[in-house]
Amino acid sequence: MAVAIKKEKTKFAPVKEVLSEKDHANYTKFQDTSKLEWFCRTSNHKKFKSHSLLKAVRNPTETRIETQTLYFTDLTNGKCGLIQLLYSSVMGGIYKGFQLNFKIFKASSEENSEEDIDIWESFKIDNIKDFDTLKVESDNVTFHFVPLENSSSSGFAQLLIKIDIPKGSTSCLLKDLKVDITVNLQEGFIINPDGSNYYLDKSISLEELAKRDSSSTSRKMIRHVFVPRGFCNGTISYKKNDKPVKLDLKDTPMLYLDAVQGLIPNKAASKWNFLCFNGEKRSMMCIEFTTTKEYGSTTVTIWAVSDKDKILEVGSSVNDHAVKFPSTKEDKQNGWKYPTSISFPRGFEESNLRLVNRYDIMSELPAFIRSIAENLANMKPFIYQFCQKSKFDDDEGVSIIESTFIN
């Protein structure tokens, strides 16, 4: 009698692996703005003609969060930061809205303080006037992608960011926030088939997974689109404790990342690691996440190395656990052991991490999403953010590193 062999099954369909140059068909480089479109808007663009925020996205039952994030590192003065536009649609549209997250921090400090953050603020964005595939505009905030006719050393597109938060509309720590910058975007990439990792409702065999048909897709996903190198020009100004601060960005290197989560954060992943290194000659980025036990505790790692105008190397792995913590420190408040040194793929190491911020991940999200997640058991969501001068290969620059622990 033949013995039936039980086939191994999975409920998680990760992106493809890129382990060597022979895997070049497993990722796609791009130099067109179609990959930069708002995913939550684009997937329903044909259905809805209106630019109305509440009509632009249909009502799935799942929660969906999309972020467009610009990380920049000014190598001349060590000022670093991020500007993030966050869109969320919760539980089929019970809540929909935009939020702006803004952070500035330093790569070094003369003070003997472990935490040294310049500013961190979040703003709810009201009065959306335009929500199109490449543009979001409100009374106070504009994010707008503009294609360049001829791809060149200037890149294939520009991201225009304008922010004007009036005095008195925020906390007493930050006032009069004004941003007017132009970002020239160089070559981007996604990991195939479509940049998405899918969380399946039903288990499928590994043979079915390899086919990559409709059985291995879902509205529940994590999707990433990367532009690992570009340059910012413009100004950022604000008042901190009523003292004016102004940053003049001139060809400041940056990383752009579009991320979509089709699940609430504690369902999507149990932990994350992130690297953005920018030097005079090249950039290195990496993102790694581990799914929850329900989806096999699977670890997906994606990385890329770029020079000033093109991508030199792309990699991705599944369950290689490429990010390592050689040394850690326990946070007495929550029990998490966050890194004091860290290593990433491609030989990037930082042995002296400099903590600039520590906060609850839910504090970046709208209050409605936060209230849902905080009511669930085993939730201790903290992000540890580091910024320091670093070296990569023969280049010197600044690295922004994040380690996130959720449950």
Curated annotation (Swiss-Prot):
Primary localization: cytoplasm
Lineage: superkingdom: Eukaryota
Keywords, ordered alphabetically: Cytoplasm, Isopeptide bond, Ubl conjugation
Protein's recorded name: Uncharacterized SVF1-like protein YLR225C
Additional free-text comment from the UniProt record: Present with 3990 molecules/cell in log phase SD medium.
GO CC aspect terms: cytoplasm
Keyword check for Nucleotidyltransferase: no
Pfam families with a match to the protein in the record: Svf1, Svf1_C
GO biological process: response to oxidative stress
Annotated compartments: Cytoplasm
Family from the record: Belongs to the SVF1 family.
